[in-house]
Amino acid sequence: MKRRTLPIAAAFAAATLMLTACGGGDDKAGDSDKIAGTGQGTEKPSKSAKPSGAPAQDKPDGVDVSLPADMNLVFDWEKPKKENEAAAMDDAANFFRGIYRGVDKRTTKDAAVTAYATGDGLHYANTQINAWIDGGWTATGTLRHYDATTRSAANGTSVEVAFCADSGKFYGKEVKTGKVLNTEPSIEDFDYYRIIMIKHPTGDGLWQASKVFVETKAAKCR
């Protein structure tokens, strides 16, 4: 979907809602009328993330993050050398897999959703999933994530994972009819994300998304 400034209810009525950010920062925290991972036109949602078919990655941390074959989240990035940043990047990807697993399963209660998110990050995930459910949509196609960077806090327990996302080939699909809501390529296909990942105090190597910031119509990602 593409970015709109309408209230969520109105955006849904127009079938063009898109969720942006939860949390404070440079991006507007209240700018939450965009559904991640879908192209947004007059009929459909539009935006999202890595190939989900890698068997070895289906159950990281014992959590099932597998997705349907037609829901392909691609994370086209290289792991950083620092161990904590590499782990945070992996779980930032799992955070997005969890969101779209929730979309597919039609629930915010799936373990993949709750394992990789906390605080504002969990609120963001729940809002995303509920927007898709309320709209009667699931997702299909390929959502590509790329040009990732990482930055660690001095204490080593917080990492910012930033990246671009291209949802030009990722579409909404009506659950009842199976109709794919195609959209034309546009600047609205490109988003720039900053995810604040924090290390779980008891989970061995587990990182959770605590805040999500999104710059929509991101020309630098084109």
Model-derived features: positions:
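Bacterial N-terminal signal peptides that target proteins for export
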Residues: 1-10
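Core segments of small alpha/beta cavity-forming domains
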Residues: 61-139
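Bacterial signal peptide processing site
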Residues: 23-26
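Structured, amphipathic secondary-structure segments that form assembly/contact surfaces
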Residues: 108-109, 114-222
